[in-house]
Design a protein with these regions (language model features):
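Bacterial N-terminal signal peptides that target proteins for export
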Residues: 3-17
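Bacterial N-terminal signal peptides
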Residues: 16-25
């Protein structure tokens, strides 16, 4: 772990040894104390360094077959481009891409419009996360498209490192064939996931809803080891690309930061 901004994310089939129980009392004030980020819309005309940190020079563990590289992050054709490419970097033979917000965000509406990569062993992810590297419990809310089957997206959430809330939702036409809209509305007692404006998961059990403010991430990465989940990795011969047109966070009490926002239609 070479930087305090390192994600320290987990493989789905392994657990992080972490004593979260002693931090549980902090959850009640975590939203107010650490929600530094306010509402925003980013159409990625550029990568704003005050908003985004580009992961560079490390990997998240043995499950990941690539090294995060800032060279794989760019703006092109009106979108943020995250690439996975064959390039010897550190102890890995591939380079991959991730960005994360510099601030944390709490309850509210999170929206992104993007096109995923394709290929077995690849993961195109839009998610929020906080964890031990930030001296907090591991809380997380996920949209993940696995390149082995781009006709569906997996939604999931972690509360103090406990997951097991996975659900697969269809992405009509394929997540890699065009831009699709992914959103979640995160409230204290409810968490709703949407794909292209359609509700695909509604969580109302408070024990299955994260409480800690989190950073927003986009990432494209691969694996040689999690083949049961992500498929057997096979490099396609050319770089794979995830393209993000827009991301937005709308704080509670606000709405319609952009015309297509789900907050214009959902109470």
């Amino acid at each position: 772990m070479t930087t305090p901004k390192q994600t320290m994310r987990r493989p789905r089939l392994a657990s992080i040894a972490f004593a979260s129980a002693c931090l549980a009392p902090l959850a009640a004030w975590a939203q107010d104390a650490q929600q530094a980020g306010g509402s925003f819309v980013d159409n990625f005309e550029r990568i704003d360094p005050s908003r985004w940190y580009v992961s560079d020079g490390w990997n998240n563990g043995p499950h990941q077959n690539c090294t995060w590289s800032k060279k794989q992050v760019s703006i092109k054709d009106g979108a943020l481009q995250l690439q996975f490419a064959q390039e010897k970097l550190g102890q890995r033979n591939y380079a991959c891409a991730e960005i994360q917000t510099t601030k944390r965000y709490g309850y509210g509406t999170y929206e992104a419009r993007y096109r995923t990569a394709t290929g077995p062993g690849l993961n195109s992810a839009f998610f929020t996360y906080i964890g031990p590297t930030d001296k907090k419990p591991h809380d997380e809310i996920d949209f993940e498209v696995l390149g082995k089957n781009v006709g569906q997206v997996q939604v999931n959430q972690y509360i103090s490192a406990k997951g097991g809330n996975e659900k697969l939702a269809p992405v009509t036409g394929g997540a890699d064939q065009g831009f699709n809209d992914y959103a979640f509305i995160w409230e204290k007692d409810r968490l709703r996931y949407f794909v292209n404006g359609e509700l695909v998961q509604d969580v109302t059990d408070p024990s299955k809803i994260p409480s800690n403010a989190q950073k927003i991430f986009f990432s494209l990465w691969g694996t040689d080891t999690l083949s049961g989940w992500m498929g057997k990795f096979a490099y396609g011969g050319a770089p794979a690309t995830m393209q993000i047109k827009r991301v937005a966070f709308t704080a509670p009490g606000e709405k319609c930061l952009f015309p297509e926002s789900i907050t214009c239609k959902i109470n």
